[in-house]
């Protein structure tokens, strides 16, 4: 009976379904993170060896087919997220977690710097039990570094991922708002400018 209820829920609201997409190639896995504005987070992951593809979008919300304007209204519950396709033989998931923690302040609720709103929350959205376990272990280890501050990162199963509008994709690599392209070359460690 319980199974019937959950399937009818997912039929009426696809946003609540798990992310059932498949990576583009065999042997690749998905990872999904939220760490504030997705532009800089995406560029950081683009530079990682073993990351084959990145895309920014909206996840963990309750509205089907959201857009940027809607999620900024604060009514959809979505996070600005990045979905990564990676080769775990080249780049272990634990490496992605390390970069995730280094890219933002996981102790600020629903904000990163001047960006404020639930869409800027911190989250790790896992695709399998191994990712869930590694995410929890990494949070426990990271919490020891923040002795007097509580980490507010949510760790949840990945819900349906809605790809953001095309102008958001690889935004900083394409030049951002100021037309200053930033390198997405593997291994690049140039500072990331948030708006281009």
UniProtKB/Swiss-Prot annotation:
Annotated region (Disordered), positions in chain: 1-23
GO CC annotation terms, alphabetical: cytoplasm
Catalysed transformations (reactions): L-methionyl-[protein] + [thioredoxin]-disulfide + H2O = L-methionyl-(S)-S-oxide-[protein] + [thioredoxin]-dithiol; [thioredoxin]-disulfide + L-methionine + H2O = L-methionine (S)-S-oxide + [thioredoxin]-dithiol
EC number: 1.8.4.11
Start-end of Polar residues biased regions: 1-14
GO biological process: cellular response to oxidative stress
Xref: Gene3D superfamilies: Peptide methionine sulphoxide reductase MsrA
Residues passing through the membrane, by range: none
UniProt xrefs under SUPFAM superfamilies: Peptide methionine sulfoxide reductase
An example molecular function term from Gene Ontology annotations: L-methionine-(S)-S-oxide reductase activity
Record's keyword terms, sorted: Oxidoreductase
Function according to Swiss-Prot or TrEMBL: Has an important function as a repair enzyme for proteins that have been inactivated by oxidation. Catalyzes the reversible oxidation-reduction of methionine sulfoxide in proteins to methionine.
UniProt family annotation: Belongs to the MsrA Met sulfoxide reductase family.
Matching NCBIfam families: msrA (TIGR00401)
Protein name: Peptide methionine sulfoxide reductase
Annotated source species: Solanum lycopersicum (Tomato)
């Amino acid at each position: 009976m319980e199974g019937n209820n959950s399937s009818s829920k997912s039929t009426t609201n696809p946003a609540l379904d798990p992310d059932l997409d498949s990576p583009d190639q065999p042997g690749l896995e998905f990872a999904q993170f939220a760490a504030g504005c997705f532009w800089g987070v995406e560029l950081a992951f683009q530079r990682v060896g073993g990351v084959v593809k990145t895309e920014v979008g909206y996840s963990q919300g309750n509205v089907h087919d959201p857009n940027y304007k809607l999620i900024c209204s604060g009514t959809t519950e979505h996070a600005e997220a990045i979905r990564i396709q990676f080769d775990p033989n080249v780049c272990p998931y634990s490496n992605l977690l390390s970069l995730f923690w280094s890219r933002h302040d996981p102790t600020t609720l629903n904000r990163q710097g001047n960006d404020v709103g639930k869409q800027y929350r911190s989250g790790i959205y896992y695709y399998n039990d191994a990712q869930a376990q590694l995410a929890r272990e990494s949070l426990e280890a990271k919490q020891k570094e923040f002795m007097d501050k509580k980490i507010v990162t949510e760790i949840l199963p990945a819900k349906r991922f809605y790809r953001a509008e095309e102008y958001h994709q690889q935004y900083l690599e394409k030049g951002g708002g100021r037309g200053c392209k930033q390198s997405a070359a593997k291994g690049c460690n140039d500072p990331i400018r948030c708006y281009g």
